[in-house]
């Protein structure tokens, strides 16, 4: 589970990560990654109404928080990650979500390395 200290809460953090971070698109999610200042790795979720009803959105959010909690220990202390769930995310397994998140993060870090 994603711990409270690793959750992104401020809208400014979301905005900075989405605006300045590297974006990778997977079939069920969009992953934004940005290496900012310290403070521990932070992960934020964006679950739009297009994902489904409130029950479906909360189910997707719980699954993504669990998946993010399993990878947060592998992140650099200054990493900021925002996961935007796409409507198809409500139909896939947690294992598939974790695979897509890991692949998206790996690709974002590679892209950031080639830009610098």
Curated annotation (Swiss-Prot):
A GO biological process held by the record: tRNA 5'-leader removal
InterPro entries listed in its UniProt record: Ribosomal_Su5_D2-typ_SF (IPR020568), Ribsml_uS5_D2-typ_fold_subgr (IPR014721), RNase_P (IPR000100), RNase_P_CS (IPR020539)
Domain of life where this protein originates: Bacteria
The enzyme's E.C. designation: 3.1.26.5
Keywords recorded for this protein, A-Z: Endonuclease, Hydrolase, Nuclease, RNA-binding, tRNA processing
A Pfam family it matches: Ribonuclease_P
Gene Ontology annotations for the cellular component aspect, listed alphabetically: ribonuclease P complex
Record-linked NCBIfam families: rnpA
Subunit note: Consists of a catalytic RNA component (M1 or rnpB) and a protein subunit.
Note: Was identified as a high-confidence drug target.
Cited function: RNaseP catalyzes the removal of the 5'-leader sequence from pre-tRNA to produce the mature 5'-terminus. It can also cleave other RNA substrates such as 4.5S RNA. The protein component plays an auxiliary but essential role in vivo by binding to the 5'-leader sequence and broadening the substrate specificity of the ribozyme.
Family per record: Belongs to the RnpA family.
The name this protein goes by in its record: Ribonuclease P protein component
Species of provenance: Mycobacterium tuberculosis (strain ATCC 25618 / H37Rv)
Encoding gene per record: rnpA
């Amino acid at each position: 589970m994603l711990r409270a200290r690793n959750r992104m809460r401020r809208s400014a953090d979301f905005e900075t990560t989405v605006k300045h971070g590297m974006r990778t698109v997977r079939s069920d999610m969009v992953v934004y990654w940005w290496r900012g200042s310290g403070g521990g790795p932070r992960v934020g979720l964006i679950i739009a109404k297009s994902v489904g009803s409130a029950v479906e959105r909360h189910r997707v959010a719980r699954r993504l928080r669990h998946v993010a909690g399993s990878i947060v220990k592998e992140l650099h202390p200054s990493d900021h990650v925002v996961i935007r769930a796409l409507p198809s995310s409500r139909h896939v397994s947690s294992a598939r979500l974790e695979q897509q998140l890991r692949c998206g993060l790996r690709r974002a870090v590679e892209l950031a390395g080639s830009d610098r």
